[in-house]
């Protein structure tokens, strides 16, 4: 039996495990409120005058931050796997994240001089949350026995989902207002008086996400055990990068089936993330949705994703992981094409429908209802694809390579995360079309699916 390292973290008590899982709850508003449903659509459709140009800038900022994260991940991963405490690194990257989120406040409508500040702030927040997550993930194996790692990981995933839904419901229900009515999603006056003419509610989403993070990450810092002691930083970097190169060579030479799956997953995960990041932006551009509609849209989509994840677990045991991924991908791609087929006065690219009439109420037009339907399809598919991807890897990798290959699994989710956003930014800038720009994500999804087909489901 291998002996424990002298500076290894002690197994966590219940409050330590809950504290670790709350990291996902703490970070989720960044993804839900800022990246997907509220601030990003405001940046494109409210902060700047030209939505296509704004989308390309937002995509470039996303891609640049993800590229930086991908470049730093191997080095930081080596540090995280060495005998160094993780919490100081998480604290440092948390400061980056919170400062970046607070910088989004400067996105006053029409303030073109603030565009570089806002984009830099968003990139800083993105880099901070991605790198803090590297160290938080590295804490997990030392907190609980190996046979219960899946349970802990699943708990954190569920807690993160709940955090996104709760933060979205609170902000949309009590703070962010419809510019036309001055009311929140619940029909209430905002809990804090804010200037609608300068879109203070939308701009406050960043600082609120930062404050949410500071409050709910505290249990992790206070109660979750960490490694103690220290070794020099240089040694684990050299050793970790050397091991990474050796492991990559072994993967490509002796485990090509696993390598093919990781390549497929890298592409379809990148495309799927891009659809989520830019789908809300596109919907808001087409129908002129404000914070109220976007909040409701986000809640509906998140609930759909939750139910999809629940169903996917049952299907995985019934028809197998690969079949679930393929089936989920077909639904996801159909939903993404459907979303892009919707315009203000047409659906399915050429079927005419009556345009939106503001006085008829929220989501009253046929185009909006079609957009919701296709978005729910995406939500239903994304959970099963994510969960079954992890399960498939566990089933096809050799038992003695599980930890190593799951490291590649995590790494593959980051290494090309910049590609789809940068491609979307470039195509949007070249064509001036938001629809054509976002359609690039379909290429990643389809190629990833095609590469998955020959993957064997046995070791």
Locations of the language-model features?
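Juxtamembrane intracellular "pre-TM" segments in multi-pass secondary transporters
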Residues: 2-18, 225-263, 356-362
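Multi-pass alpha-helical transporter architecture, strongest
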Residues: 105-106, 212-223, 342, 438-459
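Loop-to-transmembrane helix entry/capping segments in MFS-fold secondary transporters
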Residues: 52-56, 146-156, 291-292, 399-409
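Central cavity-lining transmembrane alpha-helices of secondary-active solute carriers
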Residues: 58-78, 168, 299-311
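Cytoplasmic membrane-interface "Motif A"-like loop-to-helix N-cap segments
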Residues: 80-96, 317-332
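Helix-to-loop junctions at the C-terminal end of transmembrane segments
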Residues: 71-85, 307-321, 342, 347, ...
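Short amphipathic helix-loop junctions that connect adjacent transmembrane helices
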Residues: 32-55, 277-297
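C-terminal ends and interior cores of transmembrane alpha-helices
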Residues: 91-112, 330-364
């Amino acid at each position: 039996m291998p002996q424990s390292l002298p500076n290894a973290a002690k197994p966590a008590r219940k409050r330590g495990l809950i504290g670790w899982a709350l990291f996902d709850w703490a970070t989720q508003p960044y993804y839900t409120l800022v990246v997907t449903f509220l601030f990003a659509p405001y940046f494109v459709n409210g902060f700047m005058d030209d939505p296509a140009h704004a989308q390309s800038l937002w995509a470039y900022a996303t891609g640049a931050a993800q590229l930086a994260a991908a470049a730093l991940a191997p080095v930081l991963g080596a540090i995280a796997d060495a005998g160094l405490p993780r919490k100081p690194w998480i604290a440092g990257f948390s400061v980056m994240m919170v400062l970046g989120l607070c910088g989004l406040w400067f996105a006053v409508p029409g303030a073109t001089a603030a565009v570089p500040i806002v984009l830099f702030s968003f990139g800083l927040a993105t880099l901070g949350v991605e790198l803090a997550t590297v160290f938080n993930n590295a804490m997990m194996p030392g907190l609980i026995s190996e046979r219960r790692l899946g349970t802990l990981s699943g708990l954190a995933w569920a807690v993160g989902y709940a955090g996104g839904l709760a933060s979205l419901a609170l902000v949309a229900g009590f703070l962010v207002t419809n510019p036309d009515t001055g009311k929140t999603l619940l029909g209430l006056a905002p809990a804090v008086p804010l200037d609608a003419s300068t879109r203070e509610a939308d701009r406050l989403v960043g600082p609120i996400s930062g404050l949410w993070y500071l409050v709910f990450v505290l249990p992790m810092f206070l109660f979750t055990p960490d490694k103690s002691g220290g070794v020099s930083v240089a040694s684990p970097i050299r050793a970790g990068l050397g091991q990474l190169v050796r492991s990559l060579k072994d993967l490509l030479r002796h485990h090509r089936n696993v390598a093919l799956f990781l390549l497929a997953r890298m592409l379809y995960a990148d495309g799927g993330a891009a659809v989520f990041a830019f789908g809300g932006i596109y919907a808001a551009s087409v129908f002129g949705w404000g914070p109220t509609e976007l909040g409701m849209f986000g809640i509906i989509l998140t609930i759909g994703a939750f139910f999809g994840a629940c169903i996917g677990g049952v299907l995985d045991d019934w028809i197998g992981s690969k079949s679930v991924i393929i089936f989920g991908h077909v639904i996801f791609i159909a939903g993404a094409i459907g979303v892009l087929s919707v315009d203000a006065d047409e659906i399915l690219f050429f079927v005419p429908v009556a345009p939106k009439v503001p006085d008829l109420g929220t989501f009253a037009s046929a185009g909006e209802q079609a957009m919701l339907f296709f978005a729910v399809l995406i939500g239903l598919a994304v959970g099963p694809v994510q969960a079954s991807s992890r399960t498939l890897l566990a089933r096809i990798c050799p038992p003695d390579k599980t930890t190593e290959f799951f490291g590649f699994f995590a790494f593959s989710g980051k290494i090309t995360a910049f590609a789809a956003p940068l491609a979307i930014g470039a195509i949007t800038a070249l064509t001036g079309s938001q629809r054509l720009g976002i359609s690039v994500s379909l290429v990643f999804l389809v190629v990833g699916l095609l590469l998955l087909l020959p993957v064997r489901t046995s070791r």
